[in-house]
Swiss-Prot record:
GO terms for cellular component: nucleus. It comes from Canis lupus familiaris. The gene is ARID5B. The modification Phosphoserine is found at S264, S1032, S1132. InterPro entries: ARID/SWI1_ChromRemod, ARID5B_ARID/BRIGHT_DNA-bd, ARID_dom, ARID_dom_sf. Transcription coactivator that binds to the 5'-AATA[CT]-3' core sequence and plays a key role in adipogenesis and liver development. Acts by forming a complex with phosphorylated PHF2, which mediates demethylation at Lys-337, leading to target the PHF2-ARID5B complex to target promoters, where PHF2 mediates demethylation of dimethylated 'Lys-9' of histone H3 (H3K9me2), followed by transcription activation of target genes. The PHF2-ARID5B complex acts as a coactivator of HNF4A in liver. It is found in: Nucleus. GO terms for biological process: adipose tissue development; positive regulation of DNA-binding transcription factor activity; regulation of transcription by RNA polymerase II. This is AT-rich interactive domain-containing protein 5B.
C-alpha cells in the first residue's frame, strides 16, 4: 500500500482545538481504491490471530500538531469469540460490542482491513435492492436522502457519495450491517409483511420509516447488537493508541457535580460516603476524565482501568453500605408509620438519600449543620441547582422529613422532639413541610397520628363548641362515623324504624336513651333541650340559639340543625324520633346509630349536643345526607324558636350554620333542606360562601322564614316552641299518647313526624291541652293525625330505610334523602322566601286545617281503616292530604286554642309553631276565613264528597306508593305497616314542606311572639286536625270529621272558629286536602273547586306531589313536588306562574289573605291545577332564583 494512498474524502465536517474532523477517507485495498465513510461497517482482524470482527467507523480526525490521521471505531464480535462464549440467550444474528471504542491510526486500520473475510457466514441474508430498480421513480435519491438523515447523522455526504461513484462503487461493497435490537426487530417484522414482495419495496419511504432497510450491496448480512463486553486482550494491541483520543471537553465546569455524576453512573450515590471522602471524589473525577478519553483512546482506557480497580472496589464497598443504609432507613421509617413513598426532587434532581446522609454526617449531623447554617453545603453535595434561593431550607426540610428520624434513632435520641414543621407556601416547601410534619409527628408518636387526627377534629369542634370536650366529641364522632358508615339491611332498617316509632312513642326520657344511638341526634337534642329549657323557662330563643351556635360549630350537623331548628328544638328533641320517621335515621336506617340518636337527641342535654358537635365532623356528610329528615326537626325547632324569638333564633341558627359552615351546614341542612341542593351532592354539608351569604341575607332580609331557603323552614316546630306546645298540647297528646307517640315516631321523618315525636314526648302536656281544648274530634283527630303521621311516616321511613338499607349504605341514603329533602325544603323555602308564597301556603294550610276539623272523625275512621288494611297509597295520600289540611286547620285553630299542640308535631303544626307568620296568617285566616270558608264551604262542600273521594283517589296514587317502590322492600310491606309508614313518610314530607312554608310564612308573616304563640296553638290544633283529617280516607268519615272538625275548630279558637266556621270546616275539609298544598302545588292548590281537584287523577296527582314530594324529599318522584322545589314544577307555564301569582297576590294582602287564597289560588287550582301559576311567574318569584 503506497504511503500516499491515504487521503481524506470530502470536505472537513468539524473543527475543535487541534482536531479537524472528516467524513471519509480513501485507501487502496488489493490495488483498488476504496472509500470508508462514517457509519460504515466492515470486517477487520485486529491481529492475524484474532477472530474476524465487524468495525463501525464512528470518527475520523486529523491532529494538526502531530499530523496524525486517526480513527475511532466500535468493534463487534460474535458471541463465541467473547470470553463468556455463546449461550442459549444469544440470537443467531447477534453480535456483542466491545465496551470501549478503539482509537487506531488510519494506517493501522487499513492493515486490519487487509484480510480474507470469506469465511464469515453469520448474519441474516437480506435481499439486495437492484440498482436498476433504484434508478426508477427517484428511489435512489430517496434512499440517499434517508441514509444521509439517519445513518449519517445529518451530515452532508453528497461529496463522499460522488467520490464513491467516481470510483465505480455505485454498488456499495458494504456486506454487513449491525443494527440495534429494536431496529432488527422492526426490520424482521417488515420483512415478514413484505415477504411476497420484491426487495425494492424496502426503498419506499414508508417501508424505511417503519424499519425497513434498503441494502444495495450484493450479499448484505444483517446482524444486531444488544450487549457489550470487556475485551481482555484488546488493550494490549499495539495498534490501539488511546493516548490520541481527542479531548473534546469544553471549558472547565464545577468539579462538585463530577463525583455525583460519576456516582450516578457507577451506582454509587455519594462519593463522600466513601471513607476516602473527597479523595475518592477526586479519584472519581480523574477516573471520569480518563474514562472519557478511553471512549476514544484505548491507551487511556488501559491506564484508567488500572486506576479504576481500587476505585471500583471502593465503589462496590460504597454500594453495599448504601444498600444497607437504604434498607435500614426504609424499614425504620415504615415502622414509625412514616414510610418514604416518593423521594422528592431538589434542584431538578432526585435526592440521593445516601449521599445526603453521608454529607450530613460528615458535617456533624443535623444539629451541627443547622447551628452552623451549612445546609447549602448539603445542597451542593447533592448537585442541586446553584441558582436556587431556597436551597438550604428545602434541603433541611427534606432531611427532617426523610432522614432525621432515622438519624435520631441511630444516635439513641428518638425521644428528642423533631423540629416543628412550618407550612410552606412554595410547592416544594409545602410538600416537604407537610411530609416532614407527617413523618415527624408520626415518628415522634406512632399513636399520635390517629390521635392527632382525632384531636384535630376535636380541636375545631371544641372551638366551634367550647362546651364539648374533645374526647367525648371524638368518641361521639367516631360512633357517628361508624353508624353512618355502616349501612343496615332493609329489614334492619325497618326494625330500626319501628324502634324509632317506639322511641318516639316512648316518653322523652326513655327516648333519651337513643342518644347513645345517635350522637348527631343527641347534638340536635342537646340544642333542643337547651331550647326546650329556654322555651319552658323564659329563656329567649336568641339565647338558646346562641347556645346552640356555640355548640353549632361542633354540632355542625346536629347542633347546626338544632340552632336552625332551635325554635322547635324542644319539639324536635321530643320528636327527634324524627330520625325514626326518617327511614334514614340510624334506627330506621342502619345508617348510623348517631342519627337515630337524633331522635334520642331530642330529649338529650346540651352535653349531648356538645357530643354531637364533637362528632359533627364525622357526621357532616352524613348529616348533609340526612338533611331532609333533620329538616323536619329543624323546621320544628325553628318554628318553636320563631314562636318565641323566631327571627333571632333562626338567624342565630343560620349564624351557627355559618360557623359550622362545613359540619353545621350539614346539620342545619336538617332545617335547611335546600342546603343539599345548594351544595354539591358529594358535599351536601359544605356551603359555598355565596350560598351562605344568600342564605343569611334571606334569613335576615326575608324575615327569617324566607331566609331559610335552604331548609330553615323544615324546623317548623322549634324544640323550645314544641315544649310550650307540648305543655299546651300535653293534654292532647296524652289523650292519644300511645298512638300519637308511635305515629310521631314513625312520622319523625318529616316535620310532621317531628311534631308527632314531640307529641309522644309532650303527649302528657298535650293531654292537658286536650283537656283544655277537649274536642272529641280534635282529640280523636290528634291520634288520627298521629296515626296518619305514623302511617305516612312509617311508609316514608320504611321507604327511607328500605331504600338505603337494601341497596345503599346509610351515607348514601342520607345523601339521597337529604337531596330530596333539600329539594322539598328548597321549594318550600322558596315559597316562604316569597311573601306571596308564604301567604299562599298559609292559606292552603288554613284550608287544610278547616277541612281537617270537619274530617277529624273521617280521618279517625280512615286512619283506622288504613291501619287495618286500606291501600297504603290511596289512604296515605288521602290521609296525607287530610293530614295536611288538618295541620293547616289546626295551625289556624291553635291560634284560638293552643290545645292542639298535638298537631304541632305535624308538618303544618310545625310551620304554625314557627307561626310568627302563622299568627299573621291566622289573623288573615280568621279575618278572611269567613269569605274563604263561605267560598270554601260551597266550593268544598260542593266538592266535599269529591274532595274526599278525590283525596282518597289521590291517596291511592299516594306518593308513599312511589316511595315504596323506590324503597325496594317497602312496597311489599306497604300494605299494612308500610301504609302507616308511608303516611308517616308523607307526613314527614308534608311536615317538612309545611314547616318550610310555614317557616317562611312565619318569619315573613312575622309577627310578634304572640302571633307565633297563637301560631303554635293553631299549629297544634291544625296538626291534630290534619292528622285526623289525613287519617280519614272515607268520604263519609271525612264529612263527619269535617263536621267534627268544624265543631272542634269553633270550640278551639274564636278566631279559627269564626274564620273557619262549621261550613268553613267542611269546606276546608274538602279544600284542606287539595288546598293545603294547592297554593303551593299549582295543581292541587289551584283546585279551589275541590271538585276539580277532587277527581282521583287530579287530587291524586296533586296530593301525590304535595304529600310525597313536599312531605318527603324521598318522594322526588312526585312530579309536582320536585318541580315545585326545583322550579321545575313551576315550569309548567300555567301551573308555576299562576301558583306564584297567587302566592304573590295572597302575600301582599294581609287581611284578604284568605280571600286571595280562596279566590285566586283555590279556584284556579281547582279548575286548572297546572294553570294555577304561570311557569314564568313562578320562576321569577321562586326563591330558587336567589340561590
Amino acid at each position: 500500500m503506497e504511503p500516499n494512498s491515504l487521503q481524506w474524502v470530502g470536505s472537513p465536517c468539524g473543527l475543535h482545538g487541534p482536531y479537524i474532523f472528516y467524513k471519509a477517507f480513501q485507501f487502496h485495498l488489493e490495488g483498488k481504491p476504496r472509500i470508508l465513510s462514517l457509519g460504515d461497517f466492515f470486517f477487520v482482524r485486529c491481529t492475524p490471530k484474532d477472530p474476524i470482527c465487524i468495525a463501525e467507523l464512528q470518527l475520523l480526525w486529523e491532529e494538526r500538531t502531530s499530523r496524525q490521521l486517526l480513527s475511532s471505531s466500535k468493534l463487534y464480535f460474535l458471541p463465541e469469540d467473547t470470553p463468556q462464549g455463546r449461550n442459549s440467550d444469544h440470537g443467531e444474528d447477534e453480535v456483542i460490542a466491545v465496551s470501549e471504542k478503539v482509537i487506531v491510526k488510519l494506517e493501522d486500520l487499513v492493515k486490519w482491513v487487509h484480510s480474507d473475510f470469506s469465511k464469515w457466514r453469520c448474519g441474516l441474508q437480506a435481499g439486495a435492492v437492484k440498482t436498476t430498480a433504484l434508478g426508477r421513480n427517484g428511489q435512489k435519491e430517496a434512499l440517499l436522502k434517508y441514509r444521509q438523515s439517519t445513518l449519517n447523522s445529518g451530515l452532508n455526504f453528497k461529496d463522499v457519495l460522488k467520490e464513491k461513484a467516481d470510483l465505480g462503487e455505485d454498488e456499495e461493497e458494504t456486506n454487513v450491517i449491525v443494527l440495534s435490537y429494536p431496529q432488527y426487530c422492526r426490520y424482521r417484522s417488515m420483512l415478514k409483511r413484505i415477504q411476497d414482495k420484491p426487495p425494492s419495496i424496502l426503498t419506499d419511504q414508508f417501508a424505511l420509516a417503519l424499519g425497513g432497510i434498503a441494502v444495495v450491496s450484493k450479499n448484505p448480512q444483517i446482524l444486531y447488537c444488544r450487549d457489550t463486553f470487556d475485551h481482555p486482550t484488546l488493550i494490549e494491541n499495539e495498534s490501539i493508541c488511546d493516548e490520541f483520543a481527542p479531548n473534546l471537553k469544553g471549558r472547565p465546569r464545577k468539579k462538585k457535580p463530577c463525583p455525583q455524576r460519576r456516582d450516578s453512573f457507577s451506582g454509587v450515590k455519594d462519593s463522600n460516603n466513601n471513607s476516602d471522602g473527597k479523595a475518592v471524589a477526586k479519584v472519581k473525577c480523574e477516573a471520569r476524565s480518563a474514562l472519557s478519553k478511553p471512549k476514544n483512546n484505548h491507551n487511556n482506557c488501559k491506564k484508567v482501568s488500572n486506576e479504576e480497580k481500587p476505585k471500583v472496589a471502593i465503589g462496590e464497598e460504597c454500594r453495599a453500605d448504601e444498600q444497607a443504609f437504604l434498607v435500614a432507613l426504609y424499614k425504620y421509617m415504615k415502622e414509625r408509620k412514616t414510610p418514604i413513598e416518593r423521594i422528592p426532587y431538589l434542584g431538578f434532581k432526585q435526592i440521593n438519600l445516601w449521599t445526603m446522609f453521608q454529607a450530613a454526617q460528615k458535617l456533624g449531623g443535623y444539629e451541627t449543620i443547622t447551628a452552623r447554617r451549612q445546609w447549602k453545603h448539603i445542597y451542593d453535595e447533592l448537585g442541586g441547582n446553584p441558582g436556587s434561593t431556597s436551597a438550604a431550607t428545602c434541603t433541611r426540610r427534606h432531611y427532617e422529613r426523610l432522614i432525621l428520624p432515622y438519624e435520631r434513632f441511630i444516635k439513641g435520641e428518638e425521644d428528642k422532639p423533631l423540629p416543628p414543621i412550618k407550612p410552606r407556601k412554595q410547592e416544594n416547601s409545602s410538600q416537604e413541610n407537610e411530609n416532614k410534619t407527617k413523618v415527624s409527628g408520626t415518628k415522634r408518636i406512632k399513636h399520635e397520628i390517629p390521635k392527632s387526627k382525632k384531636e384535630k377534629e376535636n380541636a375545631p369542634k371544641p372551638q366551634e363548641s367550647p362546651e364539648v370536650s374533645s374526647e367525648p366529641e371524638k368518641e361521639q364522632e367516631t360512633s357517628n362515623q361508624k353508624s353512618i358508615t355502616e349501612p343496615l339491611p332493609a329489614a334492619e332498617g325497618k326494625r330500626k324504624m319501628e324502634g324509632y316509632q317506639d322511641f318516639a312513642a316512648r316518653p322523652v326520657g326513655s327516648r333519651a336513651d337513643p342518644e347513645k344511638d345517635s350522637d348527631a341526634d343527641r347534638g340536635a337534642g342537646g340544642a333542643t333541650a337547651a331550647e326546650e329549657a329556654g322555651e319552658q323557662g323564659p329563656v329567649p330563643p336568641l339565647p338558646s340559639a346562641p347556645a346552640a351556635p356555640d355548640r353549632g360549630p361542633a354540632l355542625g350537623p346536629g347542633a347546626g340543625k338544632q340552632p336552625l331548628t332551635s325554635p322547635s328544638a324542644p319539639a324536635d328533641s321530643k320528636q327527634e324520633p324524627q330520625p325514626c320517621c326518617f327511614a334514614e335515621s340510624p334506627d330506621s336506617e342502619p345508617q348510623e346509630p348517631p342519627f337515630p340518636g337524633f331522635p334520642a337527641a331530642q330529649p338529650p342535654l346540651a352535653s349531648q349536643s356538645e357530643l354531637e358537635e364533637d362528632k359533627l365532623p364525622a357526621m357532616a356528610d352524613y348529616i348533609a345526607n340526612c338533611t331532609v329528615k333533620v329538616d323536619q326537626l329543624g323546621s320544628d325547632d325553628i318554628h318553636n324558636a320563631l314562636k318565641q324569638t323566631p327571627k333571632v333564633l333562626v338567624v342565630q341558627s343560620f349564624d351557627m350554620f355559618k360557623d359550622k359552615d362545613l359540619t353545621g351546614p350539614m346539620n342545619e341542612n336538617h332545617g335547611l333542606n335546600y342546603t343539599p341542593l345548594l351544595y354539591s351532592r358529594g358535599n351536601p354539608g359544605i356551603m359555598s360562601p355565596l350560598a351562605k351569604k344568600k342564605l343569611l341575607s334571606q334569613v335576615s332580609g326575608a324575615g327569617l322564614s324566607g331566609s331559610y331557603p335552604y331548609g330553615s323552614p323544615p324546623p317548623l316546630i322549634s324544640k323550645k316552641k314544641l315544649i310550650p306546645r307540648d305543655e299546651l298540647c300535653s293534654g292532647l297528646p296524652q289523650a292519644h299518647p300511645g298512638q300519637g307517640s308511635d305515629h310521631a315516631a314513625v312520622s319523625r321523618p318529616s316535620v310532621i313526624q317531628h311534631v308527632q315525636s314531640f307529641r309522644s314526648k309532650a303527649s302528657e302536656e298535650r293531654k292537658g291541652l286536650g283537656d283544655l281544648f277537649k274536642h272529641d274530634k280534635l282529640g280523636r283527630s290528634e291520634p288520627h293525625r298521629c296515626s296518619f303521621s305514623k302511617h305516612h311516616l312509617g311508609p316514608l321511613a320504611d321507604s327511607y330505610a328500605l331504600k338505603p338499607d337494601a341497596p345503599e349504605g346509610k351515607d348514601k341514603l342520607l345523601e339521597k334523602r337529604a337531596l330530596p329533602h333539600a329539594h322539598v325544603p328548597s321549594f318550600l323555602a322558596d315559597f316562604y322566601s316569597s311573601p306571596h308564597l308564604h301567604s299562599l301556603y298559609r292559606h292552603a294550610e288554613h284550608h287544610l286545617h278547616a277541612e281537617q276539623t270537619s274530617k277529624y272523625a273521617c280521618r279517625d275512621a280512615y286512619r283506622e281503616s288504613e291501619n287495618s288494611s286500606f291501600p297504603a297509597h290511596k289512604h296515605q295520600e288521602k290521609l296525607h292530604v287530610n293530614y295536611l289540611a288538618s295541620l293547616h286547620l289546626q295551625d289556624k285553630k291553635p291560634a284560638p286554642a293552643e290545645a292542639p299542640a298535638d298537631e304541632q308535631p305535624t308538618d303544618l303544626s310545625l310551620p304554625k309553631n314557627l307561626h310568627k307568620p302563622t299568627g299573621k296568617v291566622l289573623g288573615l285566616a280568621h279575618a278572611a276565613p269567613g269569605p274563604q270558608e263561605s267560598k270554601g264551604a260551597p266550593q268544598f262542600p260542593a266538592g266535599n264528597g269529591q274532595s274526599r273521594d278525590g283525596h282518597p283517589k289521590a291517596c291511592r296514587v299516594s306518593p308513599m306508593t312511589l316511595s315504596a317502590p323506590k324503597k325496594y322492600p317497602e312496597p311489599l310491606s306497604r300494605a299494612s305497616r308500610p301504609h302507616h309508614v308511608r303516611l308517616e313518610s308523607f307526613r314527614k314530607l308534608e311536615g317538612m314542606v309545611h314547616p318550610v312554608l310555614h317557616r317562611k310564612a312565619g318569619p315573613q308573616a312575622v309577627g310578634a311572639a304572640r302571633p307565633i304563640k297563637r301560631g303554635l296553638e293553631d299549629l297544634d290544633l291544625v296538626i291534630a286536625g290534619k292528622k285526623a283529617r289525613a287519617v280519614s280516607p272515607l268520604d263519609p268519615p271525612k264529612e263527619a270529621c269535617g263536621k267534627d272538625k268544624g265543631a272542634e275548630l269553633e270550640g278551639e279558637g274564636g278566631k279559627a272558629a269564626a274564620a273557619h266556621g262549621g261550613p268553613a270546616a267542611d269546606g276546608h275539609k274538602a279544600a284542606l286536602s287539595s288546598p293545603i298544598f294547592p297554593g303551593l302545588y299549582s295543581g292541587s292548590l289551584c283546585g279551589s273547586g275541590l271538585g276539580s281537584r277532587l277527581p282521583a287523577g287530579y287530587s291524586h296527582s296533586l296530593q301525590y306531589l304535595k304529600n310525597q314530594t313536599v312531605l318527603s324529599p324521598l318522594m322526588q318522584p312526585l312530579a309536582f313536588h320536585s318541580l315545585v322545589m326545583q322550579r321545575g314544577i313551576f315550569t309548567s307555564p300555567t301551573n308555576s306562574q299562576q301558583l306564584y301569582r297567587h302566592l304573590a297576590a295572597a302575600t301582599p294582602v294581609g287581611s284578604s289573605y284568605g280571600d286571595l287564597l280562596h279566590n285566586s289560588i283555590y279556584p284556579l287550582a281547582a279548575i286548572n291545577p297546572q294553570a294555577a301559576f304561570p311557569a314564568s311567574q313562578l320562576s321569577s318569584v321562586h326563591p330558587s332564583t336567589k340561590l
